[in-house]
Amino acid sequence: MYSEFAYSYDILMQNVDYQKRTDYLYSLFEKFDRAPTLMLDLACGTGEFSNRFANKGVSVIGVDISYDMLSVAREKSAEQQNDILYLCQDAAELDLYGTVDGAICCLDSLNHITDYGDFCNAIARVSLFLEKDRLFIFDLNTEYKHSCVLGNNTFVIDTNDVYCVWQNEYQGNNTVEINLDFFTREDNVYLRTGESFCERAYTSAEIENALNKAGLKTEAIYEEMSQNEPCDTTQRVVYVTRKM
């Protein structure tokens, strides 16, 4: 899963300021006086957040469903001499060796879980391995973003090494099918690869129901990269939740 995406992911995400986002997330842990010492990075992808938290002195467990994503993550950790445990697991079947005192899930990774039962299970599994009174911070794309921003629109991302055509098809039920065509330059030839997946936005009621069943209390909901309340045109929200 996400095999082709893994090797182009970082190029396509060049506009993401990972350090700024890491500092923002860490500040939320500190705001609630819950700075982690051993943290779960769920759906860690290529390890950008995992390594940046490790550079802050946090011990990190990175979990992702893609072997290829984790391969890239391990290379980064080796280069930075970070000792991070990476596990290839489905979020809905998360199984750690013990508990953690903090958890994150970033960049709409939970939206990739399109089955509501699996969505609830993923949150419940995080809660199971989270110590009492500690925080799980995650973000989600909103219904507005899926219906009005992604919708049936097509985007083009053009870098020196990769040309990507990003096509969206709105499926209803707040779900968008995303089809990516990559054209990667090798020598003087462009190689074409593709990746397809769906993302689903969940209603506030669905999210709160999943949190309640998992024994997590919502401490705050912010517009991403801020401490402002979300509005009707907010594209991504951040949930700060605490295990009861």
Regions found by a protein language model. Give the residues of each.
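SAM-dependent methyltransferase
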Residues: 137-210
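Class I SAM-dependent methyltransferase SAM/SAH-binding core
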Residues: 40, 48-93
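Conserved class I S-adenosyl-L-methionine
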Residues: 1-43
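C-terminal lobe and adjacent flexible extensions of AdoMet/dcAdoMet transferase-like proteins
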Residues: 204-244
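A short acidic, Gly/Pro-enriched loop at the edge of an enzyme's catalytic core
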Residues: 95-102
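A short glycine-rich, Lys/Arg-flanked "PGG" loop and its adjoining helix->strand segment in the class I
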Residues: 120-132
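Residues lining the SAM
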Residues: 106-108
